[in-house]
């Protein structure tokens, strides 16, 4: 029983180490400045700390958007929620073939600082849920929890 509690405690601790909600007052000025420079009219609904980086969640033109920003204020990637039908056809084909019975719950277009685009499809079946990552052409890259 003690081992189970230890495993659960470690799992929860590690999970929160990847992305932790923080108050705006905990966000360094350089990070906030970098965000405001790129999105001067946006209002951040939530800040998270992801390792050494920060994530700002906000709505842009009524669309859920988030950006990952480094400690110096440079935007590393932008994630924009898209309609499932906006995923490349190859993504839908891959999911139908390899994950029959699963439903795409959410879709995201991710653009890194170099302009490289990837897509993330959050799929679920019952209580099972995970993300599938694809390149800009819809070719499968990896499965993420």
Language model segments and positions:
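Mature soluble domains of exported/periplasmic/lumenal proteins and thiol-rich metal-chelating peptides
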Residues: 20-145
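Bacterial Sec-dependent N-terminal signal peptides
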Residues: 1-22
């Amino acid at each position: 029983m003690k081992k189970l509690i230890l495993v659960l405690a470690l799992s929860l601790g590690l999970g929160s180490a990847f992305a932790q909600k923080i108050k705006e007052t905990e966000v360094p000025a350089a990070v906030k400045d970098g965000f405001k420079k790129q999105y001067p009219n946006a209002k951040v609904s939530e800040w998270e700390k992801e390792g050494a980086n920060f994530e700002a969640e906000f709505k842009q033109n009524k669309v859920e958007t988030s950006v990952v920003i480094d400690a110096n204020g440079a935007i590393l990637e932008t994630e924009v929620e898209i309609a499932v039908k906006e995923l490349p056809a190859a993504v839908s084909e891959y999911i139908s073939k390899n994950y029959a019975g699963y439903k795409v719950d959410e879709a995201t277009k991710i653009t890194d600082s170099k302009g490289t685009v990837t897509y993330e499809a959050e799929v679920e079946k019952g209580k099972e849920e995970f993300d599938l990552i694809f390149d800009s052409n819809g070719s499968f890259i990896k499965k993420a929890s």
